[in-house]
Amino acid sequence: MNWKGIIFLFITSLSWSQNFYLKAEGSSLNETKVLDSIGYTKKHTSVQSIIDENKSLGNQLTQAGFLASQLLKNKKANDSTFVFYYSLGTKTQNLKIKTDLLTEEIKSTLGLTTDRIVLISETESFLNTQLAILERKGYALAKLRLENFTQENNQLQAFLIVDLNIIRKINSLVFKGYDNFPKGVKKVYERKYKQKPFNQELVKNINRDFNTLPFVIQPKFPEVLLTKDSTQVYIYLEKRKNNSFDGFIGFGTNEEKQKLQFNGYLDLNLFNNLNSGERFNLYWKNDGNKQSTFNVNLDLAYVFQSPVAIKGNLKIFKQDTIFQNSSFDLDLGYMIRYNTKVYLGIKDNTSEAIQKVSTSTIKDLKSSFYTTTFEHRKNNYENDLFPEQFYLLTKFGIGSRTLSSEKSNQFFGQIQALQLLPLNTKNYIHLKSDLYYLQSPDYYTNELYRFGGIKSIRGFNENSLQGNIFGGIFAEYRYIVASNLYVHTITDFGYFQDKANTTSSNLYGFGFGLGLLNKGGVFNLVYANGSSNGQAIKLSNSIVQVSFKTTF
């Protein structure tokens, strides 16, 4: 390489403040075409940049198989253009990587039972692939190199040398920042990762697992401490504030009973307050007129420091002075991951006709089911406006109903799903669906599935509809106006069948809404109008729902 010429060009160009141009030419027209095809950078802001590009071009020629290429000379064509003349020599197509110096154990580990022939341009990729194989098997500090290069019949040959070092296994997970991190969760992840062969992919998996936990934040990526005889992974955690409250309570006088009557609603979610990964939900609503709902739910995670989960739910629903339903669910589950669970359980329902007046559609009855449930959710807490990305719940139950000491076999199935589809950074499609089916010899109003309202098909009062079959899809187009504000449309479709009252109908809900995020929580406003069986939409039937969910 003509370094004296390059130094001269550098010195004579120090005073210039302009663009410089590099031109590479070969010993023939074909060689010049090869140089152009490599795609070197021609425009530069300094002579030093041209010198660096020359080094890069030399490396690219070597990788392309021109092992004997050399820079013959360079010259300054004018004040801003420098020409470099190359001789490329004969192109070597292949490299034969010989494995004679490898032990049988290393050959077996890498799957290299014979010599391997690769393109010169793919040599680096081949070595990186072999290094990744060793790393996955725990040889985190392994090194690979090629030695003793020889040329034979236009083919380059070299011996592969592998320095394995020792197998690295994760000895411990060290938790920093959250001293009261749930012991059950900690034990499960320690059992999952301790003594596993250490590699970078495993560290990424650890990071991914802890990012899925809704009650912690990882302020930085896990770090690894390698000592002579141990491998420790340091996981940095902070407790996330994930409790929420939404509701209001009012009171008035019941004109019929002349008694004080409370109305309003309350939706309270408590998450990991006992530092065990538990979730508690209390929901109460009384519209002051015909309906009241009380629902309490408790999820326990990693019980006895194992993948066991326990979930219990109590729900009481009262319809005016007509009937009252009580249901109790108890499930024992296995946690595939924190957000992926399967359950086996029991479900008991009791329904009582309050007025004790026998009708053809409302009866005192009890039912019991053995159930199986699958639940999976995916959240992205870096997305403040739309943290819930995906949700799937499937629940099936088989059992019997008792009515006047007469038993009837029953079966039910339910599928609920949610999917957030990002179109780009400002536009999203939000889809929810709810499918329910009850199979029975006959049906009564007070045992049917109830739906309608802001969490179901919008434009209808909450729980104002019922059916033994229901299917609905609830769609929103969401547009982000600002980092803390979005607006959305409402397009809901549904169908239900009510065999207790021999009716069925298509349902439609249309409207719009907005969501506003602030330091205290999320404010939501929804305006929706519903219709059934193609009836005309009337503005007088519109429903406006306002909520403010506070996080703490």
What are these regions (language model features)?
Residues N54, L127, T372, Q414-I415:
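Short, hydrophobic/amphipathic alpha-helical packing segments
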Residues V34-L35:
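Select transmembrane alpha-helical segments in multipass membrane proteins
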Residues M1-A24, F552:
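Bacterial Sec-dependent N-terminal signal peptides
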Residues N199, I206-L393, R450-G453, N463-G467, ...:
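Gram-negative/organellar outer-membrane beta-barrel architecture
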Residues S17, N263, N295, F390-F552:
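C-terminal transmembrane beta-barrel domains of outer membrane proteins
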